[in-house]
From Swiss-Prot:
Residues 477-487 are annotated as: Important for specificity. Hydrolyzes N-terminal residues in D-amino acid-containing peptides. The active site is at residues 62, 65. The keyword Hydrolase applies. Homodimer. The keyword Hydrolase applies. Its EC number is 3.4.11.19. InterPro entries: Bact_CellWall_Synth/Modif, Beta-lactam-related, Beta-lactam/transpept-like, D_amino_pept/lipop_sf, DAP, DAP_B_dom. It comes from Brucella ovis (strain ATCC 25840 / 63/290 / NCTC 10512). The gene is dap. This is D-aminopeptidase. It catalyses: Release of an N-terminal D-amino acid from a peptide, Xaa-|-Yaa-, in which Xaa is preferably D-Ala, D-Ser or D-Thr. D-amino acid amides and methyl esters also are hydrolyzed, as is glycine amide. One of its GO terms (biological process) is proteolysis. Keywords: Aminopeptidase, Hydrolase, Protease. It comes from the Bacteria.
Amino acid sequence: MPNIDLPTLEAFVHAIPQNYKGPGGAVAVVRNGEIVLRHAWGFADLAARKAMTPETRMPICSVSKQFTCAVLLDCIGEPEMLDSALAAYLDQFGDGRPAVRDLCNNQSGLRDYWALTVLCGAAPEGIFLPDQAQNLLRRLKTTHFAPGTHYSYCNGNFRILADLIEQHTGRSLADLLAERIFAPAAMKTAELIPDTALFNECTGYEGDTVHGFLPAINRIHWLGDAGICASLDDMIAWEQFIDRTRHDENGLYRRLSSPQTFADGAPAPYGFGLKFEETGGKRLTGHGGALRGWRCQRWHCADERISTIVMFNFEGNASDAALKMMNAALGIPPAKPVRAQANPGWFGSWLNPETGLVLSLEDAGGGRMKARFGTGPEIMDISGENEAQSSMTTLRRDGDMIHLARKDENLHLAMHRLKGEARQDIAGRYRSDELEADLLLVSEGGAIYGAFEGFLGKSDMYPLYAAGPDVWLLPVQRSMDAPSPGEWKLVFHRDAAGRITGVTVGCWLARGVEYKRL
């Protein structure tokens, strides 16, 4: 490829504080192992007036997952070495237990444990300890799809990996990372700090320019799925290590970033803690990270030996910034989607009965729709009267049915339009035997509210909103991890006499949790 258009790249970076508004951040571009651009702006602590620098450490959150998998490959070998240990760990399972490779590739079908903390009554700013993580993970008995068939993001996969690695080696993950990964890569200040409450070198902020920026409170303990704190310079060193070892057939990053497949042979979007993407026909590998008050993203294009890194101490769209930086470095112009006018027949709520997932669509103007299906809203471009797509999802409408496809997830669902009114007779207490947790629904002044109760406590009351007959939505916008699970979908079941017998509760991260009415 030709040389990087440095003025264009610098112009984009210098506009980041205006386009991604927040207290501060740090970004870098690396090509051929050399630093093309290294920049920090703003403040690491607004009250203390402490400036942000490339040496400022921040939590890299889920970017940590690739390093957990790197320790696995470097210290133990192929994932199958730990399959017997995983069987002992998930000893509540009958059939359908995932393999360790499924964990590494987010194909386990296990429900995300941070989402499940909501169902177990956790407070968003509550304390979450290591024994509570094991308590939750070891009680699991089922998956929400057959392992190896689909992709679903699951932090618990990597929490379990960390436990298995420590058990197998007899050493802490912190020591293994320092010795086997950080030292060889010259990541001089990178460190695993599992307790988020202990990190105080830089402040993460929640909020925005409308509501103001407030210091985020985090008191969770995480391991394997996240927990590493590193500076921009540490992350640059990681990209340089990747470039130095690019020709080594057994090089760590080559092994981490090797293509993966589903059980049916279809290409998978994720492997060994890395997300696989494509831009302008070029393959990218990388990962994002999020915690209340923090966002980060790294991408690497092996074909062109280019990496981009974005780290924010606020909840800005670091993934968007990192991809746009990569496109600028690669000389890929912004896409210009062709849009059609929205047909009102799109709008409303649509249910897939098999998974209990709900798709909600509303007009976003300019030939676009806002879709709610996963953890957050997606903006869909309407490309024809009955077709729409985003970067993740393709929709094809056929009357009162939408065919939803998420190619990266190997997922194809028939969504049926919800018609009619929801009955109000859902108040009561419901029990999940697998989670040993309750859902309490009450009616106050004609409005329905719900709360979750379990071994982590009793949640606040949340309002419910009707989506259609026996289908309700319960939005949860703050939880222990970030982003939050989003809207919980509640699909109620009745007997032949029309009495409520139970409810299926789920979201994209944790589908099909069955509750019976008490």
